[in-house]
C-alpha cells in the first residue's frame, strides 16, 4: 500500500476528493462496485442472515455497539431480536426485492423463499446474503445504495455491516481451513 503525503493545499484537496475510498466504490469503467464485502465479512453476513437467528436485548446491543443511530424502540418492544431487525437498523431506506444466486436452483416459491432478498423502506424482511447480493454488477445492494443515497451512505453501510458481522462471528462457531492457522515466515520471525 502506498502512502501519499500532500505537499501543498492543492494536493491535499486533490487527495481528499479523488483518492477518498468512498468516492472510489463504483468503477467508472463498467458502473459496478469494486469495493465490497469479502472473506470474513461475507461469511459473517451469510451466516448472520439465516432465517432463525435470534438474540436477546443484551446481545443485540452488543452487536450494534459501534452503530450510532440505533432505533431503540425496535429493541425495547421485543424480547427476541432477529438478525433481520438488526440489519434493518443499518439499512438506508431502500426498497428492493430480488432472488440471490441460489434462488433459481432452489425450486422455492418466490414470495416465501429465504433465497429472495426483500427490503422495504429500509426494513430487512427476508433473504440470505451472499456474494452476488453485494456485488452483482450494476444491480448489487452496494451499487443501489450508492446510486440512491450517495457514496458516504454506501461506505457507512459496509462499515456498519462489517462491524456487526465481526461481533457476531466472535460469538458464533464456524470452521476455518488449516491454511488460516499456519503463520507465514515473516510472522514466525516476529514471534
Residue ranges and their predicted role:
Residues 1-191:
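Feature marking long nucleic-acid-engaging regions of large polymerase/nuclease enzymes
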